[in-house]
C-alpha cells in the first residue's frame, strides 16, 4: 500500500538548531526563509503556499514566543527554511479540505499539530503557572516550577476488518453526515499495544472477534494530535454495533461497495490513511492479515 508518507522525509526538522536563538533569528532573516500562517481551524493559504518572512506582518524579526521552526526542505535543488505561527488566514485550506503532497503535506501536518499543542498547553499541569515557548517551538517551559514539556502525540489504531469472504466492514458514526462511512478506528489505552487495541475496539464497536491482525503503515493526523496506526484484520461473528458511537455497520463486497457509492455512499478521501486502505482493498492490493510477524 503506497501513500504520500514515504520512508524518506522531505522535511529536515533541524532539531539541533532549535535551542540556539541567534541561529533561529539569522535563519528568519534569510531570503530563503518562509512562513506558514495557520488559523485556529488548521487552515493555511495555498495561493501562494507560505510567504517570505520579510513580508510577515506584526512585529519585525524572529519572536521565540510566537514563531515555530518547522525545518528545512529542498525542492529542485533549492533549500528553504520554514517557520509557522498562529494567525488569521483568508480562505485557508485544511488537511481535510486539500490534498497536500510531498514537503507541503509534512509542513502543514507539523504546523497544525504543534500549534494546536501550544494552544492547549499554556499552563503547567503540575503547578498551574503559565508556560512559555522554548526549543524553537517544540517545547514549553513552566515559569513557576521550570518543568519542561514537549508536544504530545496520541496513538490510535485504524483497521480494515475483513471476513472469510474478503468483504470489508464499514461503519457509520452517529455524528457523521448521512451516507458517510469508514473503517473502524479508536485510541490506544494506557499500556495497550496496537494489536490489542484492534481486538478491543472491533469487539466494542462491532461485536466481532478478531483472529488475525497485521500492521500496514502509519500516518500523523493533527486533529488534534493523533498518530494513526493502520492495520488489516480478520474477524468473525455477528455484527452488533454499540449504537452510540457507531450507528450502523455492514459487510461490503467490492461489487456491493461500488453500487453503494453510486447510490450516494461516501468514503474517506485518499489524503487519509483510511481512504488509502479502503482503496488498496478495492484494488485487491491489501495484504492478507494472516501470517503477520509476531515478536
Per-range role (PLM):
Residues 198, 202:
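Hydrophobic alpha-helical positions that pack around
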Residues 192:
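Surface-exposed, charge/polar-rich loops and edge strands
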Residues 219-240:
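Active-site-adjacent beta-strand/loop module that shapes the phosphate/pyrophosphate-binding cleft
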Residues 1-121, 132, 176-181, 242-295:
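Nudix hydrolase/Nudix homology domain
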Residues 132-135, 207-216:
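Short, well-structured beta-strand/strand-turn elements
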Residues 140-182, 187, 209-210, 214, ...:
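N-terminal strand-loop-strand
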Amino acid at each position: 500500500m503506497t501513500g504520500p508518507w514515504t520512508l524518506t522525509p522531505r522535511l529536515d526538522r533541524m532539531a539541533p538548531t532549535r535551542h540556539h536563538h541567534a541561529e533561529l533569528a539569522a535563519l528568519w532573516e534569510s531570503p530563503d526563509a518562509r512562513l506558514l500562517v495557520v488559523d485556529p481551524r488548521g487552515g493555511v493559504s495555498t495561493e501562494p503556499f507560505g510567504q517570505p518572512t520579510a513580508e510577515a506582518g506584526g512585529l519585525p524579526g524572529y519572536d521565540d514566543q510566537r514563531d515555530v521552526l518547522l525545518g528545512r526542505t529542498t525542492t529542485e535543488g533549492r533549500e528553504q527554511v520554514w517557520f509557522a505561527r498562529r494567525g488569521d488566514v483568508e480562505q485557508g485550506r485544511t488537511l481535510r479540505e486539500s490534498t497536500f503532497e510531498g514537503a507541503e503535506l509534512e509542513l502543514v501536518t507539523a504546523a497544525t499539530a504543534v500549534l494546536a499543542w501550544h494552544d492547549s498547553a499554556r499552563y503547567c499541569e503540575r503547578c498551574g503557572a503559565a508556560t512559555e515557548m522554548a526549543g524553537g517551538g517544540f517545547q514549553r517551559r513552566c515559569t513557576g516550577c521550570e518543568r519542561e514539556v514537549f508536544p504530545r502525540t496520541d496513538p490510535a489504531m485504524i483497521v480494515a476488518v475483513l471476513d472469510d469472504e474478503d468483504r470489508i466492514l464499514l461503519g457509520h458514526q452517529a455524528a457523521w453526515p448521512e451516507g458517510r462511512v469508514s473503517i473502524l478506528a479508536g485510541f490506544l489505552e494506557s499500556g495497550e499495544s496496537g494489536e490489542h487495541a484492534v481486538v478491543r475496539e472491533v469487539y466494542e464497536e462491532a461485536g466481532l472477534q478478531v483472529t488475525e491482525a497485521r500492521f500496514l503503515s502509519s500516518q500523523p493526523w493533527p486533529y488534534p494530535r493523533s498518530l494513526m496506526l493502520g492495520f488489516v484484520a480478520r474477524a468473525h461473528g455477528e455484527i452488533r454495533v454499540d449504537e452510540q458511537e457507531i450507528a450502523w455497520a455492514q459487510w461490503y463486497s467490492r461489487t456491493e461497495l461500488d453500487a453503494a457509492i453510486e447510490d450516494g455512499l461516501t468514503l474517506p478521501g485518499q489524503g487519509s490513511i483510511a481512504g488509502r486502505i479502503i482503496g488498496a482493498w478495492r484494488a485487491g492490493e491489501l495484504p492478507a492479515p494472516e501470517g503477520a510477524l509476531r515478536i
